[in-house]
Amino acid sequence: MLTIVWLASAWIYLSSMRILDTQHVPDLRNLSSVTDPERLAEGERLARVYGCADACHGDRMQGQVIYSHPLNGRMVAPNLTQAAQQYTLPELEAIARQGIRPDGTSVFGMPSSSLAAMTDRDLSAVLGFIREQPAQVNVPGENDYGLLTRYRIVTGALPAQAAVQVQQPWRETFRDNEARLGEYLATVACSQCHGMDLEGRPGGAPSLDKMHDYDRFEFVALMERGMAPGERSLGLMTETARKRFAHLTEEEVDALYVYLKTRR
């Protein structure tokens, strides 16, 4: 029995290493540098909406440990303030939207497959804001995947983001169309937890078909305060709404509501 367990563990480890070490070649995409104060302020807002600031990477984007567990190992969200000064704009773009690090390996855990849809204008503003921030001295460390996380990598439950790119960046042709603006926001933000089809994930976030049951007042309360009808807390969604979606504009909340109410 111990031999079988050892062989299975060895197979998982070796198989995961092949995936982790796979080299990917990013498309070269040049973004414009942003220095305009209004654009930088918009970049700060979007960095919060999309989870870069005050969420995954910490309140000052200083990086943090996402989880640490004997079987799962250790997953880290890196220090963005240092990465923004270390890498070029094309390298940062490849990490964010293509899921490819400068060394050619894929990122895991970061929602690049969702961020892939972000427009050049939005991503330029976000990166401009991050690059303007003082470098934080925090060193969260490196990923150290445990057996269960490696099993998820091998089975595709935790996919290499470089291998699951399903879309190109949106062009700036949708802002005046309320439903299309809502679709864009859902694609870049909501899909990070609810899946690219917004149908939810097993054991995780539910299908957003639930939004058909919300009226506008209830939806605004969900986005701004993370509270479901009856003032019910929704755990991670409540935390996410307060840290991220509370920074959506009224126009964006309305657009998201229209899109989610009409999608089938």
Positions of predicted regions on the chain:
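Post-cleavage N-terminal segment of exported redox proteins
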Residues: 1-38, 99-103, 121-177, 225-229, ...
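C-type cytochrome heme c attachment motif
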Residues: 45-58, 91-97, 124-128, 184-196, ...
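Sequence/structural segment immediately N-terminal to covalent heme-attachment motifs in c-type
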Residues: 36-62, 67-69, 157-162, 170, ...
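A cross-kingdom marker for long, charged
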Residues: 217-218, 230-264
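Soluble non-cytosolic domains of exported or imported proteins
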Residues: 34-37, 46, 86, 117-121, ...
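Proline-centered turn/helix-capping motifs that create local helix->coil transitions or kinks
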Residues: 56-61, 138, 228-232
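Gly/Gly-Pro-rich "capping" loops immediately C-terminal to redox-active cysteine motifs
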Residues: 58-93, 106-119, 145-156, 195-221, ...
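Substrate-binding/catalytic groove segments of enzymes
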Residues: 102-106, 192-193, 200-202, 228-234
